[in-house]
Amino acid sequence: MLFRSAELIPINGEYKTSVIYHPMDGRIPRREGFLDFHAKRRASGLKDTDGPEGQNLSGRCLMFGAAVPSLTPGMMNPNLQIVQTKDHIMVLTEMIHDARIIRINENHLPFNIPQWMGDSVASWEGDTLVVHSINFRPEQSSSRTITLSDEFELTERYTLVSDDEILYEFTVVDNKAYEQPFSGHRILTRNRPEERVYEYACHEGNYSLPGILAGARRLESENNN
């Protein structure tokens, strides 16, 4: 099944002004003073241009957007391809070609094995697929979308509400990064049968990262002369 994740579509007959419905003001309740992985790195004296590790994940062709790409609507390449087997569900994001593997009716992995997009397990509650994810890699924290700590916990609910629509709901709990849990929802709309997910060949055309680092080394060399 191929779904588009960036449509502005009414939920229960209403066009929403925010994906967030709890808290009621529609805002993410960020905790003032919280330092995530990247902020701690900068506070220690490291610069974003010291090495590739300081650059954002999309610039390194690793991931794009939030801890789980389906959390935030994409501005481009917003397609999600959902593949289901008896024991697993795979959600492929077209942007940077992220493939998220979700195990059905399994236990979480040991906490000392952090995962890109978290360790995700799922179960069915009637016709709703409930996905619980923990143990995200700290590098996935993003000040532009979803900030996270080692306590970040995500619960998602996927409910088919028509032949062509999935109601997608999520709740984030992270007492270090946020003042309180927050929840959001939106509609995923099925694409036309002829639509396809295309390969996102990021590394092959990624000239920006070596250029950024080379420019930083050039400036350092000039300043030392």
Question: What residues fall within each predicted segment?
Answer:
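PEST-like low-complexity, intrinsically disordered acidic/proline/serine-rich tracts
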Residues: 1-225
